[in-house]
Amino acid sequence: MSEASCLASPLLYTNSGIHSDSFYASLIDSATHKAQLKQIHARLLVLGLQFSGFLITKLIHASSSFGDITFARQVFDDLPRPQIFPWNAIIRGYSRNNHFQDALLMYSNMQLARVSPDSFTFPHLLKACSGLSHLQMGRFVHAQVFRLGFDADVFVQNGLIALYAKCRRLGSARTVFEGLPLPERTIVSWTAIVSAYAQNGEPMEALEIFSQMRKMDVKPDWVALVSVLNAFTCLQDLKQGRSIHASVVKMGLEIEPDLLISLNTMYAKCGQVATAKILFDKMKSPNLILWNAMISGYAKNGYAREAIDMFHEMINKDVRPDTISITSAISACAQVGSLEQARSMYEYVGRSDYRDDVFISSALIDMFAKCGSVEGARLVFDRTLDRDVVVWSAMIVGYGLHGRAREAISLYRAMERGGVHPNDVTFLGLLMACNHSGMVREGWWFFNRMADHKINPQQQHYACVIDLLGRAGHLDQAYEVIKCMPVQPGVTVWGALLSACKKHRHVELGEYAAQQLFSIDPSNTGHYVQLSNLYAAARLWDRVAEVRVRMKEKGLNKDVGCSWVEVRGRLEAFRVGDKSHPRYEEIERQVEWIESRLKEGGFVANKDASLHDLNDEEAEETLCSHSERIAIAYGLISTPQGTPLRITKNLRACVNCHAATKLISKLVDREIVVRDTNRFHHFKDGVCSCGDYW
């Protein structure tokens, strides 16, 4: 005999065999398994009590609670003429178990049976409408609520607020809320309207209503706190988020899973990943949402290695990743720049259920491109059968990063022939490709083509065009474009103009661009470095000195040049002048060998760039101590002859290192791929893919 039978039998079968309805109602309430409910139902059939509306309603409620909606419907269908209570129970059961369409269908059947709804019917109906985001049906139900006089019922009103929030009708949700008299606004009402604004991208409105709620001395529950935390997360307001965290602790709600997820996400998005990790570690069995919040938090805050480690830990703990987990891990791989790591991630996706996911395919294309392998990106692209605009754009951007404009334009033409309409990212990739290839006419054509597709250029598009025109020497035209921008030019736009002014030694316009940058972002060291570069290019050494003094007065320090080289899947970091590596002496000897071979090959360094340019990579007294050169030396002594070297830099490639790396690639017969802050450079046989245009 089963455990359920053992539990039920003594209660079901007594000496008399007959009990009152209240006895069986109590028995239904105390059931701990759906098998017990079926035994109770069998006993009711024997006793002829299967038509008791009271007991059948109880059975429907209990079966729904156990998730057995099929049995609940079977019990309901046995009633010849069910009254309102069983109807409400089955509608509630369907709604509670997310069978929203069935809930609405049952309501339709109820109307056909000429059974009038009551105030308990509508909250479950409205939940079904919300679950389906069915605004039209929701409005129909709202009209019935009003016609039948249930519009003052607070539970019905709360359901209406939730419905309109789900359907993004915030005005209607607010109208319903405002229609509730102040004394009747429960915590559920306040939470519903706060959540409505928070979930629909209106954090300021959500916080304003939350403030009103606190002034009314309404104590928030964990649901309200989750919504408020989400609002502060949108605003990246760490101070207020911490205040809510303190309230959570004070109220003893810190173990509530949804609150932990919201707190974790808030800290991660505000850059406090260490605090987020502490909260994560408090969970005994973190669910998928928490893992995703942690992995994406690491990835979005530049902790790429930690994100990848978390992803592997998640898999090792048998937590099955979803698209969010995988795309976050792919993004982290793209940041690290390790091609071996990228290949490993690609192989993992190939073994998973997400190998045909278009969103993940586009992320893989981006990853391979950012890890220096356009061929890998193209392989993923060619294997993706269902190519939407995101996939096409990812490949075009990949070509753009590597300055392969002809391929980018050819792909765009194929995309048009395939009937896929471009988006803003498509044009950004095309502009990037034209910019890195010096194709001014084509780039200008694509920029103007955006209007034909009703796409408004964003700051990044303008920055690309300014850089394109400026590098080609069309500084006046570039400035005219800036003056005609419909929005205020940002840092990237003015930075592109200042860089172009440095290249062409246009001091007056460059100074103006620098002043705009200082007013927008006064503490950014890079702006001062750019201005100093301009003065150095124009040989205005007194002004170079003035910039250095200003930086010192503001307490600004230059970014330290750093390069990473991938050796056997591991990235080794080297900073300018760093002597801490355990193989330092070997590296130094290799650097000296490189320098001697460069001299034999006729390489002459640009001394002015080294001594007067404030860029760290160009400001070192000893030219051969540039971090890129050290990374190349380490790569040469650590990999077999002929192995390509992959270098990542945190600064733009300097003139000296660029010229030297071209010659080194020929001297050692290696391909050297360098990713700087601007683009990719593929050095081979003494030539760079950028054509010395960067």
Swiss-Prot record:
Molecular function GO terms recorded: RNA binding; zinc ion binding
GO BP term, pick one: mitochondrial mRNA modification
Location of the region described as Type DYW motif in the Swiss-Prot/TrEMBL record: 600-694
Region annotated Type E(+) motif, chain positions: 569-599
InterPro entries: DYW_dom, E_motif, Pentatricopeptide_rpt, PPR_At4g14850-like_plant, TPR-like_helical_dom_sf
GO cellular component: a single term: mitochondrion
Residue windows of the PPR repeats: 52-82, 83-117, 118-152, 153-183, 186-220, 221-255, 256-286, 287-321, 322-356, 357-387, 388-422, 423-457, 458-488
Entry keyword annotation includes Transmembrane helix: no
Region ranges (Type E motif): 493-568
UniProtKB keywords: Repeat
PANTHER family xrefs: PENTATRICOPEPTIDE REPEAT-CONTAINING PROTEIN (PTHR47926:SF396)
Family assignment from sequence similarity: Belongs to the PPR family. PCMP-H subfamily.
Record-given protein name: Pentatricopeptide repeat-containing protein At3g12770
Species annotation: Arabidopsis thaliana
Gene name per UniProt: PCMP-H43
